[in-house]
């Protein structure tokens, strides 16, 4: 907490009343704010007007070892609108062509630190990431955060407690 106070002149917590993005105030969609932390940082961008995700780019050369993982810096900090979170997802081309996947990709609306991307290499060959390579996509999604209620029993369903594979393979 003390570290946040050093970096920020004023710390503000989000209001408990969350703005609904399907009914934005004054007809405006809230901003997705981005801070570049270095000259190598590339602002997130959408490849087409209907793209769900904003491409994230590497800010440093990184090797993802065969059958291994690496944390690739973007040198960006972000602020997504209240009532949303950002999810880091794989790029389909990297997954299909090079067996590169993304892990651990949830960014909460109150996180202001640097964004890094965990890349997993499922191939037998090292994967080289260059500065500026598009490595993942960031998808801003609405969230629902209901209150937690402890109960003695849950309602019955047809599926019941059937777990992995219980509805077919």
From Swiss-Prot:
It is an enzyme of class 3 (hydrolase). GO terms for molecular function: dUTP diphosphatase activity; magnesium ion binding. Keywords: Hydrolase, Magnesium, Metal-binding, Nucleotide metabolism. Residues 1-25 are annotated as: Disordered. Its EC number is 3.6.1.23. Pfam families: dUTPase. The keyword Protein biosynthesis does not apply. PANTHER family: DEOXYURIDINE 5'-TRIPHOSPHATE NUCLEOTIDOHYDROLASE. It comes from the Eukaryota. NCBIfam families: dut (TIGR00576), PRK00601.1 (NF001862). The keyword DNA-binding does not apply. This is Deoxyuridine 5'-triphosphate nucleotidohydrolase. GO terms for biological process: dUMP biosynthetic process; dUTP catabolic process.
